[in-house]
Amino acid sequence: MASRVICFLSLNLLLLDVITRLQVSGQLQLSPKKVDAEIGQEVKLTCEVLRDTSQGCSWLFRNSSSELLQPTFIIYVSSSRSKLNDILDPNLFSARKENNKYILTLSKFSTKNQGYYFCSITSNSVMYFSPLVPVFQKVNSIITKPVTRAPTPVPPPTGTPRPLRPEACRPGASGSVEGMGLGFACDIYIWAPLAGICAVLLLSLVITLICCHRNRRRVCKCPRPLVKPRPSEKFV
């Protein structure tokens, strides 16, 4: 009997898209409308029959990765019995009836169970189908925050003159001047002019000493001749 039901459903559900558009009405209500499941999570779907005139409910599944329109029969459940598809694991799928609600339980969700689930009932020789419920793996989206660049600090204006090489003679923002000296890069701009001035002064002093020494050698140190007085000058 169960195999006949499976064959009957398989033949009638080849035109699933057309049938669902024609027969989906207020007879069936499926909840939740969408499921984002994690791997290993238990998933429960509830098919509520608003007019309980059916003898049972069938759960079906359409794989999202399959190109075939034919869905896969999962389980048939009624108030007295339930029949699972022979190719499915009984530890994975189970179903039960509570009043006018038919509950399908997927014990451990995996990627191969992703797809669209729906239920079907037969009432007065008419098949009714519920809307498709997408059941897919939950995607954890990672939101990256934009990186904002810190504004470049502007140094305050100062009244002191800028050095010739500020990058060499001025310490950095995080650096510190170590030791007593300013460093060779800065000392050369201070001592070079001083050394030049000292050299000019020394050269001037040497030239002055040489000139003075030559002038002293030109002075005649010979004794002066004695001038004898004339006779006319003696008896005046």
Curated annotation (Swiss-Prot):
Subunit field text: Forms disulfide-linked heterodimers with CD8B at the cell surface. Also forms homodimers in several cell types including NK-cells or peripheral blood T-lymphocytes. Interacts with the MHC class I HLA-A/B2M dimer. Interacts with LCK in a zinc-dependent manner.
Keyword NAD: no
Name assigned to this protein: T-cell surface glycoprotein CD8 alpha chain
Disulfide-bonded cysteines: C47-C119
Region ranges (Disordered): 150-170
One GO process term, biological-process aspect: T cell activation
GO molecular function, one term: protein kinase binding
Species, as recorded: Rattus norvegicus (Rat)
Residues of the signal peptide: 1-26
Residue span(s) of domain Ig-like V-type: 27-130
Covalent lipid sites (S-palmitoyl cysteine): C211
Claim: DNA repair is one of the keywords in the record: no
Free-text description of this protein's post-translational modifications in UniProt: Palmitoylated, but association with CD8B seems to be more important for the enrichment of CD8A in lipid rafts.
Segments traversing the membrane: 190-210
Primary localization class, coarse: membrane
Cytoplasmic topology ranges: 211-236
